[in-house]
């Protein structure tokens, strides 16, 4: 009984302790197993032992870990506060607007040559004139000072020499020549681009015209073929109408024979109705016919010579 009461009391004290330290009871079990070599829970007399360690030692180790965690969290908070203070003291430099950047890019190319000219003029005049080549003393020579006498003499000698054809590097003429050549090159490139565009346009137009002409010829051929077919159909219809107008069976047989000129296709039933005049120039050896049909044809030839009363046709 006493051991069970001690166990309950210890468990409640553990729960209350970790609830104060903002931890769940599941984490208590994890910590107990972490610090113990034997996870089994047993009691020796009046003390609870967690895996070979007493309850007091286990509590003290857990408290130490909790305090370390608190210290770490406090150090992080201090560091964050320090960062905020530094930001408030020295705020970050705000970037320029995009419009300002674009304006600077557009004006930089225009002012680049001018700035180079000014800098080169200062470099060349810095040795010839006293002091710094500023607006105040630019163009004023200090002849009295011995330090600048040699440079001034050299400049005079250079002035007496004949001017070279090529402009000096960094001089105003040098940059003028470069600018003129750039302008000429730009104009030449524009002309070339225009010529290329015109040539491409003309080529594409010619190709389109060729394609259209070929398509037109194909359509004309199709149209002519259709017209021919239509004419053939019309002629066939007219002949059929003419045949239907004449209801005589003998006329139909005669026209069919006249169209085909093939006596071998005539059936024995049609032979009595055939015009005997068709067989006047007929030779039985010219067409391979059965013996029965040849006899019928011979009979018809004989009848045609005697009289044409059976057919009623002359």
UniProtKB/Swiss-Prot annotation:
<dbReference type="GO" id="GO:0005739">
    <property type="term" value="C:mitochondrion"/>
</dbReference>
<keyword id="KW-0496">Mitochondrion</keyword>
<feature type="compositionally biased region" description="Polar residues">
    <location>
        <begin position="144"/>
        <end position="157"/>
    </location>
</feature>
<feature type="region of interest" description="Disordered">
    <location>
        <begin position="141"/>
        <end position="164"/>
    </location>
</feature>
<protein>
    <recommendedName>
        <fullName>Uncharacterized protein P4H10.18c</fullName>
    </recommendedName>
</protein>
<feature type="compositionally biased region" description="Basic and acidic residues">
    <location>
        <begin position="68"/>
        <end position="91"/>
    </location>
</feature>
<feature type="region of interest" description="Disordered">
    <location>
        <begin position="68"/>
        <end position="97"/>
    </location>
</feature>
């Amino acid at each position: 009984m006493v051991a069970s009461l001690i166990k309950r009391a210890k468990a409640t004290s553990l729960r209350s302790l970790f609830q104060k330290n903002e931890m769940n009871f599941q984490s208590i079990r994890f910590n107990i197993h972490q610090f113990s070599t034997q996870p089994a829970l047993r009691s020796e007399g009046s003390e609870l032992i967690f895996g070979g360690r007493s309850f007091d030692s286990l509590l003290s180790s857990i408290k130490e870990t909790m305090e370390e965690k608190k210290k770490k969290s406090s150090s992080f908070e201090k560091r964050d506060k320090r960062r905020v203070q530094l930001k408030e003291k020295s705020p970050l430099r705000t970037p320029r607007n995009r419009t300002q950047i674009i304006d600077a890019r557009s004006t930089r190319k225009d002012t680049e040559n001018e700035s180079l000219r000014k800098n080169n003029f200062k470099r060349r005049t810095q040795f010839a004139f006293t002091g710094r080549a500023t607006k105040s003393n630019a163009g004023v020579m200090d002849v009295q000072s011995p330090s600048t006498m040699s440079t001034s003499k050299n400049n005079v000698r250079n002035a007496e020499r004949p001017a070279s054809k090529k402009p000096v590097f960094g001089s105003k003429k040098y940059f003028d020549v470069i600018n003129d050549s750039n302008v000429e090159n730009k104009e030449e490139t524009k002309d070339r681009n225009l010529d290329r565009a015109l040539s491409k346009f003309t080529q594409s137009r010619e190709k389109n015209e060729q394609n259209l002409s070929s398509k037109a010829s194909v359509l004309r051929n199709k149209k002519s073929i259709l017209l021919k077919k239509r004419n053939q159909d019309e002629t066939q219809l007219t002949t059929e109408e003419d045949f239907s107008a004449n209801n005589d069976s003998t006329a139909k047989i005669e026209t069919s024979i006249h169209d085909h000129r093939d006596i071998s296709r005539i059936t024995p039933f049609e032979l009595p109705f055939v015009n005997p005049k068709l067989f006047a120039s007929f030779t039985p050896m010219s067409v391979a016919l059965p013996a029965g049909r040849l006899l019928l044809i011979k009979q018809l030839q004989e009848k045609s010579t005697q009289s044409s009363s059976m057919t009623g046709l002359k």
